[in-house]
UniProtKB/Swiss-Prot annotation:
GO terms for molecular function: ATP binding; ATP hydrolysis activity; DNA binding; excinuclease ABC activity; helicase activity. This is UvrABC system protein B. The gene is uvrB. The keyword Membrane does not apply. It comes from Thermosipho africanus (strain TCF52B). PROSITE patterns: HELICASE_ATP_BIND_1 (PS51192), HELICASE_CTER (PS51194), UVR (PS50151). Forms a heterotetramer with UvrA during the search for lesions. Interacts with UvrC in an incision complex.
């Protein structure tokens, strides 16, 4: 069913890793871990496992950038199969919120990327209609999605020779999300000219042309919407909904009754509490929504009523992408040391933001049920899971029935040497090391603890004649990727930053990583973080890591020992097989990143909303929220966000100490 196309055959540790993982699935192992070092070909191993197991596959990645990279690779591995992409479709996202002390209501504001929306619909359609499907997704996979039964029930089949009621047919098209437009042909529209109906689904590039003879379908074609060239003549075609959230007239009527019942209960609750302003606000807003739902079948924020449309009880898990797969499918959780903490944190963050909206009468309590899955709910839905990481966390290791190591790189590249040097004169020493790599036309990454240090160090390096830039949290994802593209091209020689792990892009030109303040204990210098940073130079034959420190912390020792263990295994393998390591330079695939760059904008808005809650919470509640969000950001390796929260926490505690509150 699946077939991998590649110029390479499995080598190094790959054949054994593939064999063990496949055998594990055949033995009924629910949870396995692929512990694969950077550059060992984990993606190729994943592809070969999919090929041998032959199940629909979901791959969850921690962000859009990495998801886009995986999507591109799997598309090239599986040209004959359906590889789909499912990530957040927002180009800009400001969540709905309310700040009580300022009486400030912030309306939801979002721009939807039509390309990604189309890819999401295509993914849903492929899962529902094919077995040979691979979906690469971000954590959007656990967010509220339409009911799979609606998507399935509302499609319809058209065949040549079939008699149709034209008016009823066009009404049904409108009902499943298509808009009638006679002039402009866009995805999700249709038009009628005489006996010809042209339909432009969002889930495919081709248009569908239906020619009638009286009430009978005479012919069906697919065509190119740009040049209108006929592509293929069909005997039958299935028309699928063009939106994720599609519902029926019966469901709308049922939902309205249920919403009115909840409204009545919540108004009674507010009146007992003496909250007459909140009651009046809620009544007015909800009745406006009901009026729109009754007249148009839609209202702004309709997703907040999804529980009523789905017929779910309060607290029941929402439908998500996982529900479209059925029972028998394979899940890879890529970069699991980041993705698992993300999956854990999504529900808590969503609930915190909505609490004020419900408490102050902007939303009914059913808004709580328009949410991502809780981690336990997600965990109950997945049956065959393979975690993939160079540094799997305790959860992955402790729950796996098998941990499969992939240490040997087919390229022969060895993990970099790690040196520990004193902090005295560290900047002068760093400049000397940068001078050496510049002569070889190679690049360097320097990781520091604060944004201020990054700025000052980058400025100093520029003064020394070095082409340097710093990456910081104010840069959006496109700008950050642009910096790394400049680094690869040689327009920049050194990048300085607090968090150089986020992108996860291949940087084979980088041969030096310098870690300043390596002996500062904390989330920025944990064992996992240090191993990940060391892996940044594992793709270059001259790879070298310098830790500037005056003592060796337990985290440093563990990271260095693990790196040396991996070096030894690779060196012995190279010697045995006569392999001479070479730096592998991959071309920079710029196109895959252009459409998918909004994760950080959403994270920034979330942090901003947290800071705004300062005025509506007690000091104790605000400190607790800051701590929770700081640890959440750190566990997801979003170190700049964690540092901003840490600084805010420090400022609050200083003010408390000085009694300036």
């Amino acid at each position: 069913m699946f077939k991998v196309y590649s110029d390479f055959s499995p080598s190094g540790d790959q054949p054994e890793a593939i064999k063990k993982l496949v055998e594990g699935l055949q033995k009924g192992y629910r949870i396995q871990t692929l512990l694969g070092v950077t550059g060992s070909g984990k993606t190729f191993t994943m592809a070969k496992v999919v090929e041998k197991v032959g199940k629909p596959t979901l791959i969850i990645s921690p962000n859009k950038t990495l998801a886009a990279q995986l999507y591109s690779e799997f598309k090239s591995f599986f040209p004959e199969n359906k590889v789909e992409f499912f990530v957040s479709y927002y180009d800009y996202y400001q969540p709905e919120a309310y700040i009580p002390t300022r009486d400030l209501y912030i309306e939801k504001n979002a721009d939807i990327n039509e390309v990604i929306e189309k890819m999401r619909i295509s993914a849903i359609k492929s899962i529902m209609t094919r077995k040979d499907v691979i979906v690469v997704a971000s954590v959007s996979a656990i967010y509220n999605c339409g009911d799979p039964k609606d998507f399935s029930d509302l499609n319809f089949v058209l065949s040549v020779g079939q008699e149709i009621d034209l008016e009823g047919f066009l009404t049904h098209l409108a009902r499943i999300g298509y808009e009638r437009k006679e002039e402009v042909a866009l995805g999700g529209t249709f038009r009628v000219k005489g006996d010809v109906i042209e339909i432009y689904p969002r889930y495919q590039d081709e248009g569908i042309r239906i020619e009638l003879f009286g009430d009978e379908i005479d012919s069906i074609y697919t065509f190119d919407p740009l040049n209108r060239k006929i592509l293929e003549k069909l005997d039958r075609v299935v028309i699928y909904p063009t939106k994720e959230f599609i519902t029926t007239e019966e469901k709308i009527q049922r939902a309205v009754k249920s919403i009115l019942k909840e409204l009545e209960e919540q108004l009674e609750y507010f009146k007992k509490q003496g909250k007459h302003l909140e009651a009046e606000r809620l009544k007015q807003r909800t009745m406006n929504d009901i009026e729109l739902l009754t007249a148009l079948g839609y209202c702004s924020g309709i997703e907040n009523y999804s529980r009523h449309f789905d017929g779910r009880n309060p607290g029941d898990p929402p439908y998500s992408l996982l529900d479209y797969f059925g029972d028998d499918y394979l899940v890879f959780i890529d970069e699991s040391h980041i993705t698992i903490p993300q999956l854990r944190a999504m529900y808590r963050g969503d609930f915190s933001r909505k609490k004020n909206l419900v408490d102050y009468g902007f939303r009914l309590p059913c808004a709580y049920d328009n949410r991502p899955l809780k981690f336990e709910e997600f965990w109950n839905k997945v049956k065959n899971v393979i975690f993939v990481s160079a540094t799997p966390g305790d959860f992955e290791i402790n729950n796996s029935q098998q941990v499969v190591e992939q240490i040997i790189r087919p390229t022969g590249l060895v993990d970099p040497e790690v040196e520990v040097r004193p902090t005295q004169n560290q900047i002068d020493d760093l400049v000397n090391e940068i001078a050496k790599i510049r002569k070889r036309n190679e690049r360097a990454l320097v990781t520091v603890l604060t944004k201020k240090t990054a700025e000052k160090l980058a400025e100093y390096l520029i003064e020394m004649g070095i082409k340097a830039l710093y990456i910081h949290s104010e840069l959006d994802t496109i700008e950050r990727v642009e910096v790394l593209k400049k680094l690869r091209r040689g327009d920049v020689e050194v990048v300085v930053g607090v968090n150089l792990l986020r992108e996860g892009l291949d940087l084979p030109e980088v041969s030096l990583v310098a870690i300043l303040d390596s002996d500062t204990e904390g989330f920025l210098r944990s064992e996992t973080t240090l191993i990940q940073i060391i892996g940044r130079v594992a793709r270059n034959i001259n790879g070298k890591v310098i830790m500037y420190a005056d003592k060796i912390t337990p985290a440093m020792k563990k990271a260095i020992d693990e790196t040396n263990r991996r070096r030894k295994i690779q060196i012995e393998y190279n010697k045995k097989h006569g392999i001479t390591p070479k730096t592998i330079i991959k071309p920079l695939d710029e196109e895959i990143f252009k459409q998918f760059m909004t994760d950080e904008d959403e994270e920034k808005e979330e942090i901003k909303t947290i800071f705004e809650l300062k005025e509506s919470l007690s000091i104790e509640e605000y400190i607790a929220l800051l701590e929770e969000e700081m640890y959440k950001a750190a566990s997801e390796l979003r170190y700049e966000d964690a540092a901003r929260l840490r600084d805010e926490l420090f400022n609050i505690r200083e003010k408390l100490k000085n009694k300036s509150f």
